[in-house]
Protein backbone atom coordinates (compact mmCIF):
# COMPACT_ATOMS: atom_id res chain seq x y z
CA UNK A 1 0.00 0.00 0.00
CA UNK A 2 1.39 3.43 -0.90
CA UNK A 3 1.59 6.37 1.49
CA UNK A 4 -1.55 7.98 0.06
CA UNK A 5 -3.51 4.78 0.67
CA UNK A 6 -2.42 4.69 4.30
CA UNK A 7 -3.20 8.35 4.95
CA UNK A 8 -6.76 8.28 3.56
CA UNK A 9 -8.22 5.93 6.24
CA UNK A 10 -6.60 8.06 8.94
CA UNK A 11 -8.29 11.16 7.57
CA UNK A 12 -11.66 9.40 7.53
CA UNK A 13 -11.13 8.19 11.10
CA UNK A 14 -10.09 11.67 12.16
CA UNK A 15 -13.20 13.25 10.64
CA UNK A 16 -15.43 10.63 12.24
CA UNK A 17 -13.88 11.25 15.66
CA UNK A 18 -14.21 15.01 15.19
CA UNK A 19 -17.89 14.63 14.32
CA UNK A 20 -18.47 12.34 17.31
CA UNK A 21 -16.83 14.83 19.66
CA UNK A 22 -18.96 17.62 18.19
CA UNK A 23 -22.16 15.71 18.99
CA UNK A 24 -20.83 14.96 22.46
CA UNK A 25 -20.06 18.65 23.01
CA UNK A 26 -23.70 19.49 22.27
CA UNK A 27 -24.70 17.62 25.42
CA UNK A 28 -22.33 19.71 27.62
CA UNK A 29 -20.72 16.86 29.62
CA UNK A 30 -19.27 19.24 32.23
CA UNK A 31 -22.77 20.45 33.11
CA UNK A 32 -23.96 16.85 33.41
CA UNK A 33 -21.10 16.08 35.82
CA UNK A 34 -22.30 18.81 38.15
CA UNK A 35 -25.85 17.46 38.03
CA UNK A 36 -24.60 14.01 39.05
CA UNK A 37 -22.80 15.53 42.04
CA UNK A 38 -26.17 16.66 43.39
CA UNK A 39 -28.39 13.75 42.28
CA UNK A 40 -26.40 10.94 43.92
CA UNK A 41 -26.42 12.47 47.44
CA UNK A 42 -30.14 13.19 47.05
CA UNK A 43 -30.80 9.51 46.36
CA UNK A 44 -28.67 8.42 49.31
CA UNK A 45 -30.41 10.83 51.69
CA UNK A 46 -33.83 9.74 50.43
CA UNK A 47 -33.31 6.27 51.89
CA UNK A 48 -30.80 7.19 54.63
CA UNK A 49 -27.85 5.55 52.93
CA UNK A 50 -29.51 2.35 51.75
CA UNK A 51 -27.91 1.64 48.39
CA UNK A 52 -29.98 0.21 45.54
CA UNK A 53 -27.37 -0.17 42.77
CA UNK A 54 -29.70 -0.94 39.87
CA UNK A 55 -32.27 1.70 40.81
CA UNK A 56 -29.56 4.33 41.27
CA UNK A 57 -27.91 3.36 37.98
CA UNK A 58 -31.19 3.58 36.08
CA UNK A 59 -31.95 6.95 37.66
CA UNK A 60 -28.53 8.30 36.73
CA UNK A 61 -28.77 7.01 33.16
CA UNK A 62 -32.24 8.50 32.72
CA UNK A 63 -31.19 11.76 34.34
CA UNK A 64 -28.07 12.02 32.19
CA UNK A 65 -30.11 11.51 29.02
CA UNK A 66 -32.60 14.16 30.11
CA UNK A 67 -29.79 16.62 30.86
CA UNK A 68 -28.04 15.80 27.58
CA UNK A 69 -31.28 16.31 25.68
CA UNK A 70 -31.96 19.63 27.39
CA UNK A 71 -28.42 20.87 26.77
CA UNK A 72 -28.56 19.87 23.11
CA UNK A 73 -31.88 21.65 22.58
CA UNK A 74 -30.42 24.65 24.39
CA UNK A 75 -27.57 24.72 21.86
CA UNK A 76 -30.09 24.65 19.02
CA UNK A 77 -32.07 27.55 20.47
CA UNK A 78 -28.96 29.57 21.32
CA UNK A 79 -27.06 29.02 18.06
CA UNK A 80 -27.57 32.63 16.95
CA UNK A 81 -26.25 33.96 20.25
CA UNK A 82 -23.34 31.53 20.42
CA UNK A 83 -22.05 32.71 17.04
CA UNK A 84 -21.45 36.27 18.26
CA UNK A 85 -20.09 35.48 21.74
CA UNK A 86 -16.36 34.77 21.96
CA UNK A 87 -16.82 32.32 24.85
CA UNK A 88 -19.27 30.17 22.88
CA UNK A 89 -18.14 30.73 19.28
CA UNK A 90 -16.48 27.29 19.15
CA UNK A 91 -19.63 25.37 20.06
CA UNK A 92 -20.63 22.83 17.37
CA UNK A 93 -23.66 24.66 15.98
CA UNK A 94 -21.95 28.05 16.13
CA UNK A 95 -19.17 26.78 13.86
CA UNK A 96 -21.59 24.60 11.85
CA UNK A 97 -19.83 21.36 12.72
CA UNK A 98 -23.22 19.66 13.14
CA UNK A 99 -26.39 20.23 11.06
CA UNK A 100 -29.10 21.95 13.08
CA UNK A 101 -31.71 19.33 12.16
CA UNK A 102 -29.43 16.57 13.47
CA UNK A 103 -28.88 18.40 16.74
CA UNK A 104 -32.64 18.94 17.10
CA UNK A 105 -33.30 15.26 16.42
CA UNK A 106 -30.67 14.24 18.96
CA UNK A 107 -32.07 16.51 21.65
CA UNK A 108 -35.66 15.36 21.14
CA UNK A 109 -34.66 11.69 20.99
CA UNK A 110 -32.68 11.88 24.23
CA UNK A 111 -35.56 13.68 25.94
CA UNK A 112 -38.18 11.13 24.91
CA UNK A 113 -35.98 8.16 25.78
CA UNK A 114 -35.15 9.65 29.19
CA UNK A 115 -38.85 10.00 30.03
CA UNK A 116 -39.69 6.40 29.18
CA UNK A 117 -36.47 5.13 30.76
CA UNK A 118 -37.23 6.79 34.10
CA UNK A 119 -40.89 5.83 33.94
CA UNK A 120 -40.16 2.16 33.29
CA UNK A 121 -37.03 1.80 35.43
CA UNK A 122 -38.06 3.97 38.41
CA UNK A 123 -41.53 5.54 38.48
CA UNK A 124 -43.81 7.89 36.57
CA UNK A 125 -43.14 10.86 38.86
CA UNK A 126 -39.41 10.81 38.08
CA UNK A 127 -40.13 10.59 34.36
CA UNK A 128 -42.61 13.47 34.43
CA UNK A 129 -40.22 15.64 36.46
CA UNK A 130 -37.48 15.02 33.89
CA UNK A 131 -39.79 15.91 31.01
CA UNK A 132 -41.00 19.07 32.75
CA UNK A 133 -37.39 20.05 33.47
CA UNK A 134 -36.38 19.81 29.81
CA UNK A 135 -39.44 21.78 28.70
CA UNK A 136 -38.85 24.47 31.32
CA UNK A 137 -35.16 24.81 30.49
CA UNK A 138 -35.71 25.07 26.74
CA UNK A 139 -38.94 27.04 26.47
CA UNK A 140 -39.15 29.10 29.66
CA UNK A 141 -35.47 29.84 30.29
CA UNK A 142 -33.67 29.62 26.93
CA UNK A 143 -36.32 31.02 24.60
CA UNK A 144 -38.06 33.44 26.96
CA UNK A 145 -36.34 34.50 30.20
CA UNK A 146 -32.76 34.52 28.95
CA UNK A 147 -33.46 37.10 26.27
CA UNK A 148 -35.92 39.28 28.17
CA UNK A 149 -34.91 39.86 31.80
CA UNK A 150 -31.79 40.42 33.87
CA UNK A 151 -33.24 37.98 36.40
CA UNK A 152 -33.11 35.19 33.82
CA UNK A 153 -30.81 32.88 35.78
CA UNK A 154 -32.72 33.40 39.01
CA UNK A 155 -35.94 31.84 37.73
CA UNK A 156 -34.44 29.85 34.89
CA UNK A 157 -32.01 28.27 37.31
CA UNK A 158 -34.87 26.17 38.66
CA UNK A 159 -34.14 23.68 35.89
CA UNK A 160 -30.70 23.02 37.32
CA UNK A 161 -32.26 22.22 40.69
CA UNK A 162 -34.43 19.41 39.38
CA UNK A 163 -31.88 16.53 39.47
CA UNK A 164 -32.23 16.38 43.26
CA UNK A 165 -36.01 16.21 42.91
CA UNK A 166 -35.75 13.51 40.26
CA UNK A 167 -33.26 11.52 42.33
CA UNK A 168 -35.40 11.78 45.47
CA UNK A 169 -38.63 10.88 43.68
CA UNK A 170 -37.01 7.93 41.90
CA UNK A 171 -36.18 6.40 45.29
CA UNK A 172 -39.29 7.33 47.27
CA UNK A 173 -41.98 7.99 44.67
CA UNK A 174 -42.79 11.23 46.50
CA UNK A 175 -41.43 14.73 47.13
CA UNK A 176 -40.59 15.64 50.74
CA UNK A 177 -39.16 18.71 52.47
CA UNK A 178 -35.48 17.59 52.34
CA UNK A 179 -35.80 17.43 48.54
CA UNK A 180 -37.20 20.96 48.56
CA UNK A 181 -34.33 22.08 50.79
CA UNK A 182 -31.79 20.66 48.33
CA UNK A 183 -33.71 22.37 45.53
CA UNK A 184 -33.40 25.66 47.43
CA UNK A 185 -29.64 25.23 47.89
CA UNK A 186 -29.03 24.94 44.16
CA UNK A 187 -31.65 27.57 43.34
CA UNK A 188 -29.91 30.20 45.49
CA UNK A 189 -26.41 29.01 44.49
CA UNK A 190 -27.06 29.43 40.74
CA UNK A 191 -27.13 33.27 40.55
CA UNK A 192 -23.75 33.85 42.29
CA UNK A 193 -22.20 31.06 40.24
CA UNK A 194 -23.55 32.31 36.91
CA UNK A 195 -23.18 36.03 37.53
CA UNK A 196 -19.54 35.63 38.55
CA UNK A 197 -18.82 34.09 35.14
CA UNK A 198 -20.99 36.66 33.37
CA UNK A 199 -19.00 39.48 35.00
CA UNK A 200 -15.94 38.18 33.21
CA UNK A 201 -17.73 37.95 29.86
CA UNK A 202 -20.21 40.82 30.17
CA UNK A 203 -19.11 42.35 26.87
CA UNK A 204 -20.05 39.10 25.13
CA UNK A 205 -23.57 39.33 26.54
CA UNK A 206 -23.83 43.00 25.59
CA UNK A 207 -22.83 42.26 21.99
CA UNK A 208 -25.30 39.36 21.83
CA UNK A 209 -28.09 41.46 23.32
CA UNK A 210 -28.60 39.10 26.27
CA UNK A 211 -29.64 41.11 29.38
CA UNK A 212 -27.58 39.10 31.86
CA UNK A 213 -27.37 41.14 35.08
CA UNK A 214 -23.63 42.00 34.78
CA UNK A 215 -24.27 43.27 31.25
CA UNK A 216 -26.95 45.76 32.32
CA UNK A 217 -26.04 46.67 35.92
CA UNK A 218 -23.02 48.14 37.68
CA UNK A 219 -20.41 45.88 39.27
CA UNK A 220 -21.46 47.13 42.69
CA UNK A 221 -25.09 46.19 42.04
CA UNK A 222 -24.09 42.76 40.73
CA UNK A 223 -21.76 41.91 43.60
CA UNK A 224 -24.40 43.03 46.11
CA UNK A 225 -26.86 40.59 44.53
CA UNK A 226 -24.19 37.89 44.55
CA UNK A 227 -23.69 38.49 48.27
CA UNK A 228 -27.41 38.27 49.03
CA UNK A 229 -27.83 34.99 47.16
CA UNK A 230 -24.69 33.55 48.75
CA UNK A 231 -26.17 34.17 52.19
CA UNK A 232 -29.42 32.53 51.08
CA UNK A 233 -27.46 29.54 49.77
CA UNK A 234 -25.64 29.01 53.04
CA UNK A 235 -28.88 29.42 55.00
CA UNK A 236 -30.52 26.73 52.86
CA UNK A 237 -27.64 24.30 53.50
CA UNK A 238 -28.09 24.78 57.24
CA UNK A 239 -31.84 24.13 57.00
CA UNK A 240 -31.06 20.80 55.34
CA UNK A 241 -28.92 19.93 58.38
CA UNK A 242 -32.17 19.19 60.22
CA UNK A 243 -32.46 16.02 58.10
CA UNK A 244 -28.84 14.93 58.60
CA UNK A 245 -26.30 14.26 61.32
CA UNK A 246 -23.73 16.62 62.80
CA UNK A 247 -21.18 15.64 60.13
CA UNK A 248 -23.02 17.31 57.27
CA UNK A 249 -23.98 20.24 59.49
CA UNK A 250 -20.36 20.90 60.43
CA UNK A 251 -19.14 20.73 56.84
CA UNK A 252 -21.99 22.95 55.63
CA UNK A 253 -21.14 25.52 58.30
CA UNK A 254 -17.41 25.63 57.55
CA UNK A 255 -17.85 25.53 53.76
CA UNK A 256 -20.53 28.19 54.01
CA UNK A 257 -18.19 30.48 55.91
CA UNK A 258 -15.58 29.99 53.20
CA UNK A 259 -18.07 30.71 50.40
CA UNK A 260 -19.35 33.81 52.18
CA UNK A 261 -15.82 35.08 52.70
CA UNK A 262 -15.14 34.95 48.96
CA UNK A 263 -18.42 36.71 48.16
CA UNK A 264 -17.71 39.44 50.72
CA UNK A 265 -14.19 39.89 49.37
CA UNK A 266 -15.53 40.36 45.85
CA UNK A 267 -18.08 42.91 47.03
CA UNK A 268 -15.54 44.76 49.18
CA UNK A 269 -13.05 44.84 46.31
CA UNK A 270 -15.60 46.42 43.98
CA UNK A 271 -16.55 49.02 46.59
CA UNK A 272 -12.88 49.86 47.07
CA UNK A 273 -12.34 50.23 43.32
CA UNK A 274 -9.90 47.32 43.15
CA UNK A 275 -9.47 45.11 40.04
CA UNK A 276 -12.32 42.61 39.85
CA UNK A 277 -11.54 38.86 39.87
CA UNK A 278 -14.96 37.23 39.52
CA UNK A 279 -13.64 34.00 37.98
CA UNK A 280 -12.19 33.02 41.34
CA UNK A 281 -15.65 33.03 42.87
CA UNK A 282 -17.06 31.20 39.85
CA UNK A 283 -14.52 28.38 40.07
CA UNK A 284 -14.68 28.07 43.85
CA UNK A 285 -18.48 28.03 43.79
CA UNK A 286 -18.24 24.70 41.97
CA UNK A 287 -15.94 23.38 44.68
CA UNK A 288 -18.27 24.66 47.38
CA UNK A 289 -21.30 22.87 45.97
CA UNK A 290 -19.29 19.67 45.48
CA UNK A 291 -18.01 19.76 49.07
CA UNK A 292 -21.49 20.31 50.51
CA UNK A 293 -23.13 17.52 48.51
CA UNK A 294 -20.24 15.09 48.99
CA UNK A 295 -20.55 15.69 52.72
CA UNK A 296 -24.27 14.98 52.39
CA UNK A 297 -23.53 11.70 50.61
CA UNK A 298 -21.05 10.57 53.26
CA UNK A 299 -23.38 11.66 56.04
CA UNK A 300 -26.22 9.65 54.50
CA UNK A 301 -24.31 6.36 54.41
CA UNK A 302 -22.71 6.64 57.86
CA UNK A 303 -24.88 5.58 60.78
CA UNK A 304 -24.81 8.77 62.86
CA UNK A 305 -27.68 10.27 64.87
CA UNK A 306 -29.60 13.00 63.07
CA UNK A 307 -29.78 16.54 64.43
CA UNK A 308 -33.55 16.76 64.80
From Swiss-Prot:
- The reply to whether RNA-binding figures as a keyword in the UniProt entry is no
Query: Which pathway does it serve?
Result: Porphyrin-containing compound metabolism; heme O biosynthesis; heme O from protoheme: step 1/1
Q: What class of enzyme is it?
A: transferase
Chief location of this protein within or outside the cell: membrane
Q: Any one cellular component term from GO for this entry?
A: plasma membrane
Q: Which domain of life does the UniProt lineage start with?
A: Bacteria
Any Pfam family matching the protein:
UbiA
As its record notes, the protein acts as a catalyst of: heme b + (2E,6E)-farnesyl diphosphate + H2O = Fe(II)-heme o + diphosphate
Show the Gene3D superfamilies listed in the entry.
Answer: UbiA prenyltransferase
* EC numbers, comma separated: 2.5.1.141
Transmembrane ranges, per UniProt, are 20-40, 50-70, 102-122, 124-144, 149-169, 170-190, 227-249, 288-308
Q: Which GO terms describe its molecular function?
A: protoheme IX farnesyltransferase activity
> An example of a Gene Ontology BP annotation on this entry?
heme O biosynthetic process
Q: Where in the cell is it found?
A: Cell membrane
Question: What are the entry keywords?
Answer: Cell membrane, Heme biosynthesis, Membrane, Transferase, Transmembrane, Transmembrane helix
Is the keyword Transmembrane in the record?
yes
Where is coiled-coil annotated? none
Query: How is the protein disposed in the membrane?
Result: Multi-pass membrane protein
HAMAP family according to UniProt:
CyoE_CtaB
State any further remark: Carbon 2 of the heme B porphyrin ring is defined according to the Fischer nomenclature.
Would you identify the family this protein belongs to, as annotated? Belongs to the UbiA prenyltransferase family. Protoheme IX farnesyltransferase subfamily.
* Known role: Converts heme B (protoheme IX) to heme O by substitution of the vinyl group on carbon 2 of heme B porphyrin ring with a hydroxyethyl farnesyl side group.
This chain's protein is named Protoheme IX farnesyltransferase
Amino acid sequence: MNVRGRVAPRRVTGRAMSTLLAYLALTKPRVIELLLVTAIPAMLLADRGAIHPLLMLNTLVGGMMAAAGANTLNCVADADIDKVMKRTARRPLAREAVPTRNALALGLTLTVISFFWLWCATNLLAGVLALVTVAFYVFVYTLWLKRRTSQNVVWGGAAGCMPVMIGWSAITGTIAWPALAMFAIIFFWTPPHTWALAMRYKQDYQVAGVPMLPAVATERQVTKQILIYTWLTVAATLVLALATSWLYGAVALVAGGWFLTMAHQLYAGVRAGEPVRPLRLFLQSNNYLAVVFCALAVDSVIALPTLH
